């Protein structure tokens, strides 16, 4: 085995973790303020100081999660992704009351537009405080999709120059990267070991002026370890496969127990429908205490997860905070 295969990251335990959904595909202000177990799932309030505000949290096809870690008297905050539009994330952070000066890093899970859309705006909101952007080099490349009738459509591109600001450190890496004083690691390129998680068959990437099939090597996520509970694995879209991602997190941390799996599982669309049951089979084997499918998991797959893992399932909605 080479050094990459023997990789083991020095992930530190956290006492607790909070994950707040800034942007997701779904919003529902009628959900109960807390749900069993009430200490873990809390919704954004419908009314503030006895009044329903005239404005509302926005939902869009995208993802942005605020992750906070707590260890003794030490607290760290970071974002995973920044949604699609330039509007949704800044608007929701203001409504939720996020103190942007405390955000230490933004991790971009991969270079698709529904994950980097408001990055420039977030960095402007954080200024003049310093912040790092952790990102795979491929996230800056031109992407495209092949449509059913053969047409090729180009995706928006994240321009590196748009995020080159005096307060921003751009960390381009293909490997796991330490954040939050070692309490969070971005995963880097995820090993693909399952025989059924095949990425996006219609995805293309431009290299040296030519489009080629895109295995979306930049797809990754976050891993944390809660003392006495186990790993928390958060995915952006899980183009690498949600099972692959969890198993890779287990491998590089040396921790087998999984407490929570959260994020987009990319089971949307007809080409992924056939993978839903197999994916849930494997998730049942992993047996997390909590599972929170979001974003590109799709309505049908989310409902099947709820049916097959009813005790572990948590419904996500914009503004929800999960206290782990």
Question: Language-model features: where?
Answer:
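Cap/insert and terminal regions of metallo-dependent hydrolase folds
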Residues: 112-116, 132, 212-318
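Metallo-beta-lactamase
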Residues: 138-220, 314-324
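Divalent metal-coordination and catalytic microenvironments
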Residues: 67, 81, 93, 110, ...
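Active-site metal-binding motif and surrounding structural segment of the metallo-beta-lactamase
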Residues: 87-135, 253-260
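A structural motif corresponding to the C-terminal end of an alpha-helix
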Residues: 68, 162-170, 227, 286
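Zn-dependent metallo-beta-lactamase
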Residues: 1-75, 186-217, 222, 226
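Short acidic, glycine/serine/threonine-rich loops at helix termini
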Residues: 33, 144-148, 273, 305
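Pre-active-site segment of Zn-dependent metallo-hydrolases
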Residues: 54-61, 69-105, 248-252
């Amino acid at each position: 085995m080479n050094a990459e295969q023997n990789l083991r990251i020095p992930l530190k335990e956290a006492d607790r973790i909070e994950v707040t959904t800034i942007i997701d595909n779904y919003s529902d202000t009628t959900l109960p303020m807390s749900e069993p177990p009430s200490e873990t799932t809390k919704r954004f309030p419908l009314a503030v100081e006895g009044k329903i505000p005239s404005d509302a949290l926005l939902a869009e096809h995208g993802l942005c999660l605020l992750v906070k870690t707590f260890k003794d008297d030490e607290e760290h905050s970071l974002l995973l992704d920044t949604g699609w539009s330039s509007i949704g994330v800044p608007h929701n952070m203001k409504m939720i009351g996020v103190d942007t000066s405390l955000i230490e890093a933004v991790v971009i899970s991969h270079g698709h537009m529904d994950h980097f859309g408001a990055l420039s705006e977030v960095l402007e909101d954080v200024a003049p405080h310093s912040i790092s952007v952790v990102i795979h080099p491929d996230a800056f490349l031109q992407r495209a999709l092949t449509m059913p009738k053969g047409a090729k459509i180009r995706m928006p591109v994240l321009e590196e120059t748009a995020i080159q600001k005096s307060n921003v450190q751009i960390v381009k890496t293909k490997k796991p990267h330490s954040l939050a004083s070692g309490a969070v690691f971005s995963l880097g390129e995820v090993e693909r070991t399952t025989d059924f998680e095949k990425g996006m068959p219609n995805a293309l990437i431009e290299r040296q002026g030519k489009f080629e099939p895109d295995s979306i090597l930049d797809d990754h996520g976050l891993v944390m370890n809660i003392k006495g509970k186990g790993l928390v694995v958060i995915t952006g879209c899980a183009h690498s496969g949600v099972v692959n991602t969890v198993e890779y997190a287990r491998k590089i941390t040396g921790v087998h127990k999984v407490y929570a799996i959260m994020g987009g599982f990319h089971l949307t669309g007809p080409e992924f429908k056939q993978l839903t049951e197999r994916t849930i089979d494997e998730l049942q084997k992993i047996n997390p205490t909590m599972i929170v499918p979001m974003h590109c998991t799709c309505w049908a797959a989310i409902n099947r997860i709820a049916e097959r893992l009813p005790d572990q399932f948590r419904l996500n909605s914009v503004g929800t905070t999960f206290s782990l």
